[in-house]
């Protein structure tokens, strides 16, 4: 029998319903795995007592034949989802001992469906980063290793802890957040399905903000079916979030295994020109095009002329919003406060923020403050907003001809810890292919589609029309079926 912690969400639900094992046994299998792989630093707060208590309640519900859709399923939450009575830090010193007195809407939705929380996962500080190296709790190590080298690799970011937890069989599924690629890029680096729904599908209430017009909750799973199950539980209108979309939660599970006949898939191959993409990624892209063609889809060559400006636009808009959002951390109401005798209020602000924020967060606050200053507002911020609209228009034009768009999730395979972190510009380019869809607020997923020559997983990104999570899952499921001969499992786990 498969080890319990290696079961998918769907298989776990089936096993629990059939009384093959209990939720308590399932949770204990995950706890054992977490204890065994603490060196990966995937979790920053463990909630094992809570998980076992929730598992007991789940077992009672199964005994009475009254289970919810996620009854007894162990999941992890990125440490920017507020959890009532449980430390929530966004992996920043400024919030290191913050304990919220309310629950985020997304975690509440999962609890309402019977989910069992194992703990809070590590992340880049305030979700700013793409390698999970800016956390105040230290970096996360990927469960994966290259076949020609034993060096520690990054899991991607900013949701690196969630990616490592699911990839290393330390959670059945894990919540992440995606602002410019923080679910899709780590999913690509760790061989997982990472899904970011349409902006507004999941409530942002109770999520620690980075860039409010871009932030969206997402999910990591080990199968596309699991992704559809988790999304149905997470999504839904919430009056506590003014950007929440008032739309029914669609049925998504029937998308799995659906026919690709008559589907048109857009491929913007011109975005891969100029040597930005590693050859292995280019090969995966071409192989996936053939796979979808053989499955009955029509491949359409498209262009997204303004997508190449995506990174520049993102690194004006996101820091601008962050500099505003992060102004609330001042040492007055909650979080860290640095004090000394006879200091003024301004000195307290200055010392608290200097001690509380890490280098990358300070860098982005300064960029944001600069682009919002009166002398730069027109030249940077307003111009970036105009180009953002052009990026969205490109997608609208493309979707007049196609049902979904195919792009790699990342231009490279996972790299070594410390390899690129001294050059912020190179780090920012990790999100080259994920940012455009974020700027347009579109649903998108990364699905494992191949291995590099060094045996590392590579993810293919599928982008859909607004509110069309169904077709994204349909394409992702077809790709998943086409590569089922490949084992996307790290060695030694």
Swiss-Prot record:
Q: Which Gene Ontology MF annotations are present?
A: ATP binding; glutaminyl-tRNA synthase (glutamine-hydrolyzing) activity
How is this protein annotated for GO cellular component? glutamyl-tRNA(Gln) amidotransferase complex
Annotated EC? 6.3.5.7
Where are the active-site residues found? 78 (charge relay system), 158 (charge relay system), 182 (acyl-ester intermediate)
Which branch of life, at top level?
A: Bacteria
Swiss-Prot/TrEMBL keywords:
ATP-binding, Ligase, Nucleotide-binding, Protein biosynthesis
How would you classify this enzyme at the top EC level? ligase
> Which GO biological process annotations does it have?
translation
Which cysteines pair up through disulfides? They are none
Q: According to its UniProt record, which reaction does this protein catalyse?
A: L-glutamyl-tRNA(Gln) + L-glutamine + ATP + H2O = L-glutaminyl-tRNA(Gln) + L-glutamate + ADP + phosphate + H(+)
Q: Which family does it belong to?
A: Belongs to the amidase family. GatA subfamily.
**HAMAP family, sorted:** GatA
The protein's matches in NCBIfam families, at most eight in alphabetical order, are given as:
gatA
The record's section on PANTHER family has: GLUTAMYL-TRNA(GLN) AMIDOTRANSFERASE SUBUNIT A, TRANSAMIDASE
Could you give the subunit structure recorded for this chain? Answer: Heterotrimer of A, B and C subunits.
Q: What does this protein do?
A: Allows the formation of correctly charged Gln-tRNA(Gln) through the transamidation of misacylated Glu-tRNA(Gln) in organisms which lack glutaminyl-tRNA synthetase. The reaction takes place in the presence of glutamine and ATP through an activated gamma-phospho-Glu-tRNA(Gln).
Mind telling me what this protein is named? Glutamyl-tRNA(Gln) amidotransferase subunit A
